[in-house]
Amino acid sequence: MVELYQKLLGMRRIKRKISWRVSAKPVSEEDLNRDLLASKLLKAGDVLMVHSSLSSIGNVLGGPEAVCRVFQRVLTESGTLLMPTYHQPEPILKMIKKGSLVDLRTAESTMGKLTETFRTIPGVKRSSHPFSSVSAWGRYSKEMTSGHENSPYICGPGSPFAQLIERSAKYMGIGIDIRVIALYHVLEENWSDFPLRVHYPKPFNVRYIDPSGNRVERQLIILDPAVAKTRIDREVEGAWIRKWLTNYMRTKGILHGFKVGQANSWIVGSQSFYDEMKSLAIRGITIYTTEREFNTIKKEG
């Protein structure tokens, strides 16, 4: 009964979303291009990671293909565009246990229609990770998708995420909040003095087919779900830290808000965001900090 209710509720939400997109004012490529340029936050040659909710932009003429073209047009081939082409880890791990292999040449992104469309564009390259791959287009696409297989950590040294820091990339969200920023985990997995243990203590073996068609077997270290109960991406438990951190980064001049079509959007500089998160962690404030812990830190500090 509960499952049926959840299914019906999900169908109603989808119908409302489709109805809103159809009735919304059409958004053209020129509109999107104008929005990006008017923000004065992007330029040719930038390295940019984009997370998105396509439906939040509105009724985009040309669909996700048009959105991809606009970003390519703004960044030009001298820039680099990246998008997450993740899968949920649980189904992938179940597949592996059953002896099946995820094939990164064909496996679809579960991060939305825009990311899946981007993945299939000619010239786009994909990193070698069974459930946290990144796809990239442009000048550094090969370099930024190479090396993901060399670290057991998702955001470890050489990963596309760590390279965002090294290349002074910009990080953008369209119609979504800051829970999606992977730079949090770059800090956890590259700074030895991070104040919490957030990973399983032991690695586990995974097998998959990489974007070149090679069978890969290697070890991975993943985040511990038990520790993640209060993390920033948790809908209820993480709501307070999302709100506080958004305001904090905006006040610091690190997070900049603007519109893309109908979507409330934001952009941060990867290096400045990383540095500020490190400064907060030194004070004991992380994406896992509860509101009670935060208030205690404030009283003591």
What are these regions (language model features)?
Residues 25-30, 64, 153-154:
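A conditional alpha-helix N-cap/helix-loop micro-motif detector
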Residues 32-34, 41-96:
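N-terminal active-site beta-alpha-beta segment that forms phosphate/nucleotide-binding
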Residues 40-45, 73-80, 121-125, 163-170:
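Secondary-structure boundary elements
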Residues 65-66, 186-192:
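Short, solvent-exposed amphipathic alpha-helical segments in soluble enzyme
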Residues 91-183:
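Internal, conserved structured core segments that host functional sites
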Residues 1-24:
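Membrane-proximal basic amphipathic "stem/tether" segments
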Residues 217-301:
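Acidic/aromatic/glycine-rich contiguous surface patches that form carbohydrate-binding/processing clefts
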Residues 194-226:
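Short, flexible loop segments at boundaries between secondary-structure elements
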